[in-house]
């Protein structure tokens, strides 16, 4: 009996010990599990908080890509480009036309020739009629082409996209720009009184091809000019935005536009002199072509004559670049905000 009772007590103690031990083990496991879960939760939350902006950015980029592939997006870009380009071109031409007239008269004058300072707005009305569609057409080609090339080319070749888009825009818009330029410069040099008379008499004397006099020299000047000016402008804006870590304001856009215009104006002055001489000569055919024009100018007037009118040209394009790109970016911003509001509504 004593042995049995002793064995029962021993068994009970052992059972209690086992249950106690098991209970402690279970509580340790649970406690350990809770500790691990509590430790893991901040990490998971931290990962989620880091991951959410990335997901949002990816989703945003994907939405933009889908939106850019939408034909409606292309039409909107085209529409906005036509408006911004046309408006900017007209504003610059109207504001700085007298400086352009002075530049043209200086370039045409031979040694000892007198510069006429009257009628500095001669031909402005007819010129604006051509500048509006020409500028609109340029940007209608430039902006969509630029956006398409930037999507295809790597980031380190963005300058190539700007160069190519500028050259292509210049080539397409030259269809309208050249006749406009021919009429403008002949009126600036006093050959005609009004734009309609100029068009009628040029076609009567020289045929329809007279409206495209100096077309080759125009492309020789304007394709490099358009490509360089817009490449310099776009690249400077990219660099400035990266350095400032914000969008540019209106004065900064105007300042960069002025610099890009002035630099490009200096580099392309000889090409502008050649183009002007060929366009204003009319049916007299003093120069037989680009190469003959260069040789004749150097032989008769010296190589310095190729830089005639550089001062007014740089002033005109520098100030013009400031106004042009300032108006351009502001108009783009206004149209973009209106489009965003209508989309959200």
Swiss-Prot record:
<feature type="transit peptide" description="Chloroplast">
    <location>
        <begin position="1"/>
        <end position="31"/>
    </location>
</feature>
<keyword id="KW-0472">Membrane</keyword>
<dbReference type="GO" id="GO:0055085">
    <property type="term" value="P:transmembrane transport"/>
</dbReference>
<dbReference type="Pfam" id="PF00153">
    <property type="entry name" value="Mito_carr"/>
</dbReference>
<keyword id="KW-0677">Repeat</keyword>
<keyword id="KW-0813">Transport</keyword>
<feature type="transmembrane region" description="Helical">
    <location>
        <begin position="309"/>
        <end position="329"/>
    </location>
</feature>
<dbReference type="InterPro" id="IPR018108">
    <property type="entry name" value="Mitochondrial_sb/sol_carrier"/>
</dbReference>
<dbReference type="GO" id="GO:0031969">
    <property type="term" value="C:chloroplast membrane"/>
</dbReference>
<feature type="transmembrane region" description="Helical">
    <location>
        <begin position="254"/>
        <end position="274"/>
    </location>
</feature>
<keyword id="KW-0949">S-adenosyl-L-methionine</keyword>
<keyword id="KW-0934">Plastid</keyword>
<dbReference type="InterPro" id="IPR002067">
    <property type="entry name" value="Mit_carrier"/>
</dbReference>
<feature type="transmembrane region" description="Helical">
    <location>
        <begin position="156"/>
        <end position="176"/>
    </location>
</feature>
<keyword id="KW-1133">Transmembrane helix</keyword>
<feature type="repeat" description="Solcar 2">
    <location>
        <begin position="157"/>
        <end position="239"/>
    </location>
</feature>
<keyword id="KW-0812">Transmembrane</keyword>
<keyword id="KW-0809">Transit peptide</keyword>
<protein>
    <recommendedName>
        <fullName>Probable S-adenosylmethionine carrier 2, chloroplastic</fullName>
    </recommendedName>
</protein>
<comment type="similarity">
    <text>Belongs to the mitochondrial carrier (TC 2.A.29) family.</text>
</comment>
<keyword id="KW-0150">Chloroplast</keyword>
<comment type="function">
    <text>Probable S-adenosylmethionine (SAM) transporter able to catalyze both uniport and exchange reactions through membranes.</text>
</comment>
<feature type="transmembrane region" description="Helical">
    <location>
        <begin position="121"/>
        <end position="141"/>
    </location>
</feature>
<feature type="repeat" description="Solcar 1">
    <location>
        <begin position="76"/>
        <end position="148"/>
    </location>
</feature>
<feature type="transmembrane region" description="Helical">
    <location>
        <begin position="82"/>
        <end position="102"/>
    </location>
</feature>
<feature type="repeat" description="Solcar 3">
    <location>
        <begin position="252"/>
        <end position="334"/>
    </location>
</feature>
<dbReference type="InterPro" id="IPR023395">
    <property type="entry name" value="Mt_carrier_dom_sf"/>
</dbReference>
